[in-house]
Amino acid sequence: MSPPVPERLSVVDEIKQTKPFPTKSAEAYVGLLRTADESKRHLGDLLEPAGVTLQQYNVLRILRGAGEDGLPTLTVAERMIERTPGVTRLIDRMETKGWVERRRCTEDRRRVWCKITKKGLDLLEGLDRPIEAVDAVFDAALEPDELERLIEYLDRVRAEMRASQTVAGGW
């Protein structure tokens, strides 16, 4: 027997919108923001027992993917999902916990390289299985071809937002 299908609410019903959105774009944007918030809360709930924040998890994943050499701090900041001006302080806290280590670049003393430690790798390994539950949500909600289209649509929206910022000099 298949598990029950969760009740699907439109964003209009979910936020108890009493007036129609002025445009479909506005409705889609609110839906995207609500989905992003729900996703962040879901992931945060999975990470909380391990004492890891979303941003810390993101840094650990970036550094694990970088391999043994690690990455410059600024590169880590550029690759983060949720960009933060406080990446140095974030990495300070992670270094205190023993999850990452830093070293100055010998060629350019202004550059600082970050590398994930064994403790950080072990932490991530313990989180890999629970995080698969996040993927399972997408797999349950969408067919593979729908996921491909969603990825394409999101890429297009982000590209348009970047182009709009460039043309308008920011929002």
List each language-model region with its residue ranges.
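N-terminal helix-turn-helix DNA-binding core of bacterial DNA-binding proteins
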Residues: 33, 37, 41-83, 166-171
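Alpha-helical linker/hinge and terminal dimerization helices associated
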Residues: 39, 80, 123-139, 157-168
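N-terminal leader segment of winged-helix/HTH proteins
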Residues: 1-50
